[in-house]
Amino acid sequence: MKRRTALFSGAGLSLAAVTVADAQTPAGGAKERVVIQVSTPEQKLWNQALNYLDNLSEIYGPGNVEMELVALGLGIGVLKLESTQGPRIADALKVGVHVSACEVTMRRQRLDRLDMLPGIGYVPAGLGQIIKRQRQGWAYISG
């Protein structure tokens, strides 16, 4: 079977290598699972992370990849109501991306759920969520 390797890198975000079979569907019908961490307010890094989500969805096809974006630290501001990335976050949510805000960061920045974009999820600790996902076998992309 021919295989292709896609290398994701750039602007501080990296993923080792993802091998995709020509069928574009993981073996045995299992879903690929990817968690992306963004801990910076830099718009170009957020754009890159959101582009990665679009690319992964296109590479694997609808329903074949489960994706979670975890925002923590300085990156949490991009999930606030006034964020310029709001429309792209909404688009990601519409295609099934789990967008998670770190509640530790929110408390430290005195933010509550009313300050945040509608439709996002919340995790007690962003780093804890990433560790949990890695233990569950998810691929990890950091930013």
Give the predicted meaning of each segment.
Residues 1-23:
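N-terminal export signals
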Residues 21-143:
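Secreted/extracellular ectodomain signature
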